[in-house]
Amino acid sequence: GWIDRYFSNVKKMWEKGCSFTVELMPYDGLIDDIDEIINLCKSELGAACQITVGRNDLTEKKDLLTSMSRKEYESVWRKFDSTMFDFKLDIFQKKIDDFCYAGVWTLYVDLGTGASKPCYGQLSNQNIFKNPEQPIIFNPVGKHCRQPYCYNGHAFLTLGVVPELETPTYADIRNRVCEDGREWLSKEVKDAFSQKLADNNEVWDEKKKNSYERKYPFIFFKTALYDWKEIYNKVIRKRKK
């Protein structure tokens, strides 16, 4: 069946030296299958899969995607002993107040269109495919995150877009050590994922941060205007036709 084919493909990659990770989106309909899922992953891949934390994007605070209380949700899914799950719950609905370097140290690019933005949760501010001769805009989020919390912090925060925060490494989030000692990440990938972005990028001093903060209202206005035009051209104009 499809599940057998899935695990067969993952193991083929592993046998050829590729790094991999297997991740599950936990939802209430899977609760009765938890033991079976864990045992299947251990049998096929030597360890239980990592699990994320589901969110309800239809709610203002992006609440947990579950009918259970947070305490019940945590108790049920802790069985996977997942570093990803633990960290995502730890940062759940906690607003980031420190200066965030997403946008200057990171860039989210839609490979289908070229639309780009600092991270998943911010406004689009450019298209790097339409005008490849133009310099890429690298503007940090700073202290102006639009989201109630960093819902994909398992990637951005662990890589260090907010250097002041103590977090696991991205390798901790993605790797698993099997019962026989093998690991899902190769040494090279594990070493790369264990770094922090501050190791190889400029950390701004307070003077540079303050200068950026003074310019931010103008940057935001320009970004909002660009993002609105993108939405108009893609959605509203298309509907009118």
Where are the regions a protein language model picked out?
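Flexible mid-to-C-terminal extensions adjoining Fe-S/redox cofactors in radical SAM and related proteins
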Residues: 115-241
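Radical SAM enzyme [4Fe-4S]-AdoMet core and its adjacent flexible, acidic
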Residues: 1-117, 121, 126-130, 165-173
